[in-house]
Amino acid sequence: MVPEPGPVNSSTPAWGPGPPPAPGGSGWVAAALCVVIVLTAAANSLLIALICTQPALRNTSNFFLVSLFTSDLMVGLVVMPPAMLNALYGRWVLARGLCLLWTAFDVMCCSASILNLCLISLDRYLLILSPLRYKLRMTAPRALALILGAWSLAALASFLPLLLGWHELGKARTSAPGQCRLLASLPYVLVASGVTFFLPSGAICFTYCRILLAARKQAVQVASLTTGTATAGQALETLQVPRTPRPGMESADSRRLTTKHSRKALKASLTLGILLSMFFVTWLPFFVASIAQAVCDCISPGLFDVLTWLGYCNSTMNPIIYPLFMRDFKRALGRFVPCVHCPPEHRASPASPSMWTSHSGARPGLSLQQVLPLPLPPNSDSDSASGGTSGLQLTAQLLLPGEATRDPPPPTRAPTVVNFFVTDSVEPEIRQHPLGSPMN
């Protein structure tokens, strides 16, 4: 985070003589800031412990979440407490040597949080847009390399310019006694803001908009599938030859399935809208004010402190918003914390996708399972019911994201299921049986 370009001409602020003054803020301000600090530290610590202790959550996708929660935890433990003292006392009350160090950690932790949000959006983008290639592209070493790159960029944008004095270029202002408001020139503010906010936020908008378009396209494709001549159930469509069609049931089930996918597309739109709104509401005012302050010096210290804490609150909301839309996090939290309600687990195919599940496997939006049982014996019960050997039975399963499917009618013979969307599935064993011979 870029500190406020306050009225100082050195990275070492001036302190007035005597003991620190009494807090100038009211009691409710101190209480509110303490609640924000405790909630930030507790929520991020809980989710880090949850991922580390639950085997179901230890996967490549959650590497980025651990990095995000770590940066937000550092904001709550290292950045917020001195900032609270600064806001309450109106001056820097800690050791003067800690001012520059605290400012550097402020920039690094907040920048790392924003860059980790960008990595999470990239991970979701690859998972939804290229689910079959996700495991090949997003391996554990590549994920760790991306995380290391994000933290390195955040450190370079914070410690290096401050230690070398690049933030003071072109500035000549009188110092304010007792203040720890770092001098920042317009070039430094523009470069730091562009690298740590505007470029990552553009990438976040691009990836989430592509995900939203993919969700809507999937809903349209499913709706077009339900308008075919085949009988579409709510989650199971069975084509059997011969079979008597029932047009009334076709149209009703098709409308029901289309409506459900339309609702899911709308829910995905609202989810992305909430995430993007929270991100820009918390951080955009701060960076706009930073640029305005560097240009015209027209932002009061009180208003800048409010905008700074608004950006800090993004680290409080991240551990609440992101797991809120992840079902596996809810179930793991229910097992980890007994008082938390654990939603029931749905039986879903490993190929079923969800933007907000943290599994790293490839899971496309539509799972089609082809079931090809061999011809049944002439004296089987199915022949007497259908009037002859049924020959070929095709089962196409439309699996909605994150939902359980209805159990199909029990087959007369156990079919061989081939899932074409699971890359590491075992090859099925094919055996030949002559027509009319019994199968084991």
From Swiss-Prot:
Residues 1-27, 89-96, 168-185, 296-301 are extracellular. Disulfide bonds join 99-180. One of its GO terms (molecular function) is serotonin receptor activity. Residues 53-62, 123-142, 210-268, 326-440 are cytoplasmic. Keywords: Cell membrane, Disulfide bond, G-protein coupled receptor, Glycoprotein, Membrane, Receptor, Transducer, Transmembrane, Transmembrane helix. InterPro entries: 5HT6_rcpt, GPCR_Rhodpsn, GPCR_Rhodpsn_7TM. The chain crosses the membrane at residues 28-52, 63-88, 97-122, 143-167, 186-209, 269-295, 302-325. One of its GO terms (biological process) is positive regulation of TOR signaling. It is a multi-pass membrane protein. It is found in: Cell membrane. G-protein coupled receptor for 5-hydroxytryptamine (serotonin), a biogenic hormone that functions as a neurotransmitter, a hormone and a mitogen. Also has a high affinity for tricyclic psychotropic drugs. Ligand binding causes a conformation change that triggers signaling via guanine nucleotide-binding proteins (G proteins) and modulates the activity of downstream effectors. HTR6 is coupled to G(s) G alpha proteins and mediates activation of adenylate cyclase activity. Controls pyramidal neurons migration during corticogenesis, through the regulation of CDK5 activity. Interacts with CDK5. Interacts with MTOR. Interacts with RPTOR and NF1. Belongs to the G-protein coupled receptor 1 family. This is 5-hydroxytryptamine receptor 6.
